[in-house]
Amino acid sequence: MANNNSNSPTGPHFLFVTFPAQGHINPSLELAKRLAGTISGARVTFAASISAYNRRMFSTENVPETLIFATYSDGHDDGFKSSAYSDKSRQDATGNFMSEMRRRGKETLTELIEDNRKQNRPFTCVVYTILLTWVAELAREFHLPSALLWVQPVTVFSIFYHYFNGYEDAISEMANTPSSSIKLPSLPLLTVRDIPSFIVSSNVYAFLLPAFREQIDSLKEEINPKILINTFQELEPEAMSSVPDNFKIVPVGPLLTLRTDFSSRGEYIEWLDTKADSSVLYVSFGTLAVLSKKQLVELCKALIQSRRPFLWVITDKSYRNKEDEQEKEEDCISSFREELDEIGMVVSWCDQFRVLNHRSIGCFVTHCGWNSTLESLVSGVPVVAFPQWNDQMMNAKLLEDCWKTGVRVMEKKEEEGVVVVDSEEIRRCIEEVMEDKAEEFRGNATRWKDLAAEAVREGGSSFNHLKAFVDEHM
């Protein structure tokens, strides 16, 4: 069925294919580095879209010699820019993008697989991220084993699995009744605030739900599908057992570069150096989430009224939309800029892991993207959880209720239907993390930091799981 490495004198050759989003690229590249750098004889070809490469979404420097890079076309090599405003036009634009990526991606990756075979460097296993089921199809066409790299917590994988396997009606009913809850096998009690937003029919991105159904159905076509997950055994032990045994769950995280040498400097680091230990709020909502103008105003008010020093990262998201389509986030806060600059610092980019490991950081106000969530745990930093969409809702619940490293903001729906967290609520959460329960939250965060470090070092749970996965392809 599959290429057996016994016929290849050079060891296993893994093909990694990642969806063109930062939350997929970062953990994929880290896993590729670990395979190429720590597993004897393993080689990796890391394939990202041409658009991701052109936007410099990852670095090709300082990688093992056995890791090489390749590209595939997603049909939008200059980047996908949507001019969609309505839900219908947004759905159509995204659908067209996914269809074109499937068509062009299959063409270019087919060439890559065939070229490597001709040069006697055949791939022996394909690893792909969420939303790329066509890569699994391509692997089957070439009789190659494949593994899904799930870049969210195993708890979220379990929710999607159960939704599509017997619990769809129950979860949908719960999602439409705000006061109700549901208990899925081996998972904590869930409310509508906790489930991935794609499952809620009223959510503007609910049209993406079929892509996750396709993902689960694709896995079921395999006899014993393997799912590599960016988590570690000690973090989600109950959720590991919530999926049927024929789905082989392989926790290999946290897939972060656990650096201890922070030689990089910048103006923001010099600014942090002047602040007292655990005194600074670090605020970041990632590279995708765009806050409404009303929400930005409330956040500005909260930061100004708290009078605590803060470092706020507002990334440039203009590449996602056509020019002048909407007011930039930085422009939205211009009327508050003078007051903000008196207390804190607003930057367009920072080395987040470097910042989270700075002695001055006392709290991370985060959108709860999974990479950021893991970085908060690995750095031992308490959080104010401020989720926006998809898995971030569940990540926020895990941080607050299960791992107990912070608090989650309580949003409210205004008359016009807009969901906003007001400044008073943001301030309340900040004070709880920085003052009222600071010692408790930091103690819990430090515990997870130590467990994460143990998991990835030689002999740790994630190290051993990854080695066992590679051994299957030796």
From Swiss-Prot:
CDD domains per record: GT1_Gtf-like
Name used for this protein in its record: UDP-glycosyltransferase 75D1
Transmembrane segments: none
InterPro entries for the chain: UDP_glucos_trans (IPR002213), UDP_glycos_trans_CS (IPR035595)
PANTHER family xref list: GLUCOSYL/GLUCURONOSYL TRANSFERASES, UDP-GLYCOSYLTRANSFERASE 75D1
Sections of the chain in a coiled coil: none
Single GO MF annotation: UDP-glucosyltransferase activity
Keyword Repressor: no
GO biological process, one term: response to toxic substance
EC number: 2.4.1.-
Binding site for UDP-alpha-D-glucose: 287, 350-352, 367-375, 389-392
Function per UniProt: Glucosyltransferase that glucosylates kaempferol. Can glucosylate the phytotoxic xenobiotic compound 2,4,5-trichlorophenol (TCP).
Family: Belongs to the UDP-glycosyltransferase family.
Gene name as annotated: UGT75D1
UniProt keyword terms in alphabetical order: Detoxification, Glycosyltransferase, Transferase
Enzyme class: transferase
